[in-house]
């Protein structure tokens, strides 16, 4: 219940703009300005109580409290490490980012790429911070986290060994922005060790809020050049690199003056006519301008004389230090990997770019209800969350004569790094995309059933199921309606996720779910309609007062169920019996009369029939995944969120729902629906309650 309330509050705050870059969420409710002012007024240096300078901040295993790697570590402020510490000197450069004793080169490569774009760097690393003016031992940074910008505060106590920084550091040793940025990122992920191992694209996204894709250049898609051109038109960040095969290869220079293991950026892609044929050219920038390509189309290559002079002037006049052209074929031959970070519309301030259309949807997998696993598990796969993608407009320009709608889908699992120290790690995740059948077109209130997935193949799917934070693929499909189904590989894996869709043209995306519905059977009978046999039975069970209390009902039903071999049950709890009496007790006596008991008896017989029919394996019990079908048979349709609540409330540790809990769930649902209907006679879908009424209904 508390989780549902928290989600409602969060949704309302997001609707008001909280979580945007301008109104970043204050991580752990720590306000940088307020904390700094407190320290300045008190004349003290900030000590962060939420990420203290203790062994647990370092790690849990390799960097755990008893590891040899953490012996002799001292936490020191930059003012204790060098005589004249600086936050940032003359702008951020790659020499500010030297790896330490932590396997987070993926993160450092992303930080290095960040230094190529001053505007984006300033969003992540506010530059008006200093060890001189208003210094209070406190610094702040901003990260994108699953659709929200979060401001993270840290103190400047850094782990050192023998007087040297243990982790990331600058080459000259007196610049500390990168070390403090790494500490803030470690804080939001739980500890430093949680940063060990990852993909550069993960860092790209957390620093920009963009969606990052990558390509192995030994196996490029046929339309890669067009993808690069469109990415540049949309203001995307493009980086490329040459793989290293050994430590000795790092920063090694090839015979044509390219540096292995080095982060380059791609800044242009043009087609020119050269000697009567079209030549595809790529412009590369070595951000530190030290070494430039000496192969074809380098600055002094005679190939430039084979193209139109005006074209040559246009391509070379804005030449920056370290920037050079090369043929696309040479690019594919010499470089190993291309990474593209497609930026969100809010990141791009210039109107010169053709911006992506962005949609984000949040969801979760919950054990026993919405964590159905992949297609290998047909009995539960259909229980996964489902999302409708409606593609309406084709791209403006066709690629290789192929028309359609281009879009990127990124499925991100949330907060898994933070859970590493609790023994958790990344789930293996992926997704499928299914074409909506014509008869269901235009409907958004139908959760596709098990039978649909047994008889329909995926139109597209993620390239693989993999245990990375994000699975991302680019697709091109004809206009139409499609259902996207995200899942873990195996069922019953709890997790939160977000899905982002970047599309060239405006498209509609939304969760697909059953609408809330209750078809409740109405009993229009009088006592005169009840047969004599049932009257005699009631008189025998009720005794002298001719009414049945919850305690008497418990005894009666225990005897009835004891005779049933097809339903495993220890009888009904007194709690279930009380809510059954409460549902039908029209006169407030706390007991059931003849008519009320007859209605209840009829309902219980119906519940038994449903329970037996849903129990296809004849185990005498029902598992939580069968509960959705059972509720439908009883007249209830529920969205995924309600199924999650029902399973959490009524299933045991083995995800079994016994007959007692099954009946209790149905009775409680029927009671709540009847109360709501009574208070909402106009069927508006909303009611107003004061506190005392809310509390009275909540303790039902």
UniProtKB/Swiss-Prot annotation:
Residues that bind Ca(2+) 1: 658, 661
Regulation acting on activity, per entry: Activated by 200-1000 micromolar concentrations of calcium and inhibited by calpastatin.
Binding site for Ca(2+) 6: 585, 587, 589, 591, 596
Biological role stated in the UniProt entry: Calcium-regulated non-lysosomal thiol-protease which catalyzes limited proteolysis of substrates involved in cytoskeletal remodeling and signal transduction. Proteolytically cleaves MYOC at 'Arg-226'. Proteolytically cleaves CPEB3 following neuronal stimulation which abolishes CPEB3 translational repressor activity, leading to translation of CPEB3 target mRNAs.
PROSITE patterns referenced in this protein's UniProt entry, alphabetically: CALPAIN_CAT (PS50203), EF_HAND_1 (PS00018), EF_HAND_2 (PS50222), THIOL_PROTEASE_CYS (PS00139)
Species per Swiss-Prot/TrEMBL record: Macaca fascicularis
Sites where the protein binds Ca(2+) 3: 89, 91, 96, 175
Region (Domain III) residue spans: 345-514
Record-given protein name: Calpain-2 catalytic subunit
Modified residues (N-acetylalanine): 2
Binding locations of Ca(2+) 5: 542, 545, 547, 552
Positions bound to Ca(2+) 7: 615, 617, 619, 621, 626
């Amino acid at each position: 219940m508390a989780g549902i309330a928290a989600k409602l509050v969060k949704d309302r705050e997001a609707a008001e703009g909280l979580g945007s870059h301008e109104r970043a969420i204050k991580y752990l409710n720590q306000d940088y300005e307020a904390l700094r002012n407190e320290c300045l007024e008190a004349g003290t240096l900030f000590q962060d109580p939420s990420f203290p300078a203790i062994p647990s901040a370092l790690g849990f295993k390799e960097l755990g409290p008893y590891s040899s790697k953490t012996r002799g570590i001292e936490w020191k402020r930059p003012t204790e490490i060098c005589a004249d510490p600086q936050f940032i000197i003359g702008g951020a450069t790659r020499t500010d980012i030297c790896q330490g004793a932590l396997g987070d080169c993926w993160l450092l490569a992303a930080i290095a790429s960040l230094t190529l774009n001053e505007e984006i760097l300033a969003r992540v690393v506010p530059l008006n911070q200093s060890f001189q003016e208003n210094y209070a031992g406190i610094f702040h940074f901003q990260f994108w986290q699953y659709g929200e910008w979060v401001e993270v505060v840290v103190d400047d106590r850094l782990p050192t060994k023998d007087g040297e920084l243990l982790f990331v550091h600058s080459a000259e040793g007196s610049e500390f922005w990168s070390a403090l940025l790494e500490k803030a990122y470690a804080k939001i992920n739980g500890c430093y060790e949680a940063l060990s191992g990852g993909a550069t694209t993960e860092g790209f996204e957390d620093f920009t809020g963009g969606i990052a894709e990558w390509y192995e250049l030994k196996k490029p898609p046929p339309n890669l050049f067009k993808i690069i051109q469109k990415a540049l038109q949309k203001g995307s960040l493009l980086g490329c690199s040459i793989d290293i095969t050994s430590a000795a290869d790092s920063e090694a220079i090839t015979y044509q003056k390219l540096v292995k293991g080095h982060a380059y950026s791609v800044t242009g892609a043009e087609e020119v006519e050269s000697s009567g044929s079209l030549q595809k050219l790529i412009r590369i920038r070595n951000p530190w301008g030290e070494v430039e390509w000496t192969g074809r189309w380098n600055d002094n290559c005679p190939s430039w004389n084979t193209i139109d002079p005006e074209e040559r002037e246009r391509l070379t006049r804005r030449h920056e230090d370290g920037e050079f052209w090369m043929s696309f074929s040479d690019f594919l031959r010499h470089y190993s990997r291309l990474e593209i970070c497609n930026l969100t519309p809010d990141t791009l301030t210039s109107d010169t770019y053709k911006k992506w259309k962005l949609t984000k949807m949040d969801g979760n997998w919950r054990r026993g209800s919405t964590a159905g696993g992949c297609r290998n598990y047909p009995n539960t796969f259909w229980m996964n969350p489902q999302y409708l993608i409606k593609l309406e407009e084709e791209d403006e320009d066709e690629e290789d004569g192929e028309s359609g709608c281009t879009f990127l889908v990124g499925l991100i699992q949330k907060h898994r790094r933070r859970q590493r120290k609790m023994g958790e790690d990344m789930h293996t995740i992926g997704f499928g995309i299914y074409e909506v059948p014509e008869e269901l077109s235009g409907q958004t209130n139908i959760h596709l059933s098990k039978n649909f997935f047994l008889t329909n193949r995926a139109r597209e799917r993620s390239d693989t199921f993999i245990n990375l934070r994000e699975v991302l693929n680019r697709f091109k499909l004809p206009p139409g309606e499609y259902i996207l189904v995200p899942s873990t590989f195996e069922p019953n894996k709890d997790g939160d996720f977000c899905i982002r869709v970047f599309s060239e043209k405006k498209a509609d995306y939304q969760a697909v779910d059953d609408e809330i519905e209750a078809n409740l059977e109405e009993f229009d009978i009088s006592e005169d309609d009840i047969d004599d046999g049932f009257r005699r039975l009631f008189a025998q069970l009720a005794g002298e007062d001719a009414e049945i209390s919850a305690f008497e009902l418990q005894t009666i039903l225990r005897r009835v169920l004891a005779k049933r071999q097809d339903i495993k049950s220890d009888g009904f709890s007194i709690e279930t019996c009380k809510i059954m009496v409460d549902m039908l007790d029209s006169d407030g006596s706390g007991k059931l009369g003849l008519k009320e008991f007859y209605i209840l008896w009829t309902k219980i017989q119906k519940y038994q029939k449903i329970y037996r029919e849903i129990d296809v394996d004849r185990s005498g019990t029902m598992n939580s995944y069968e509960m959705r079908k059972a509720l439908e048979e009883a007249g209830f349709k529920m969205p995924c969120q309600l199924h999650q609540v029902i399973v959490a409330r009524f299933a045991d540790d083995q995800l079994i729902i016994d007959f007692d809990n099954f009946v209790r769930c149905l009775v409680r649902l029927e009671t709540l629906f009847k109360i709501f209907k009574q208070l909402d006679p106009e069927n508006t879908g909303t009611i107003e309650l004061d506190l005392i009424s809310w509390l009275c209904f909540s303790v039902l």
